[in-house]
Amino acid sequence: MKTSPLPLPPDVRAAAEDILGHDGIREEFAWMSWAGTVWRLNGERGTLFLKRAADLEGERARLVWLDGRWPVPRTAGFFHELGDDWLLTHPVPGVPMSDKSLGWEPDRVARSLGAFLRELHATDAVGCPFGVAKPGNVLIHGDYCLPNVLVENGLLSGLVDVGLSGLGDPETDLAAGVWTLSYIYGPGFARRFLEAYGWPPMSDAAIEKLRRKYSR
């Protein structure tokens, strides 16, 4: 996986400059995950995010469909250059729930993560072209971990890395939530997350089995 976007392909740079201005773009590494590498592009007229990965067509299509349904980034450009896909997006407000600057206690993080997910899974997904429509399936995020959920003023404000979203088993997102809370805060907060979501009570062994369903 590439750790630097430089040099930016000409078409990518031109698209970014059309939005940010031609007075120089400053590239800043943002994060890296299994889904790709992301940079923050800063210019005189604002900020864009640039993701680079082998295949981002699915994520681009999902961002278009989810726009207006979930608080996802708006697409600013999509390119295939140098053997990879390059996805330009506008920023969404808020900070990731994994960010210490949020200042929340783990209990509040866990309960908010569960409450947000309950709302997301209640989204009307009629006509969703991704995943499988069958009884019990809902519109899932697909990688519902703390870094991918943004909040502002105590409310859900953004969702990123939606390349696996679509109709699916709600346990997919529940497993990711249990895993991310255990990874960042240790055991003990998964139950609060599940309670806030409204999931039936589970034994410790069942929660651990659910956690193990998450794999990235």
Language-model segments: residues:
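Juxta-kinase regulatory segment immediately upstream of eukaryotic protein kinase catalytic domains
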Residues: 1-25
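ATP-binding glycine-rich phosphate-binding loop
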Residues: 19-42
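A conserved alpha-helical element in kinase catalytic cores
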Residues: 35-36, 47-87, 99-119
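Active-site beta-strand termini and strand-to-loop segments that position acidic
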Residues: 40-44, 90-91, 152
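Residues on conserved beta-strands of the protein kinase catalytic domain
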Residues: 85, 137-138
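Short pocket-lining segment of the protein kinase catalytic domain that shapes the ATP-binding cleft
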Residues: 87-95
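Active-site Asp-x-Gly
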Residues: 138-140, 152-202
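Conserved catalytic-loop position in the HRD/HxD motif
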Residues: 143, 148
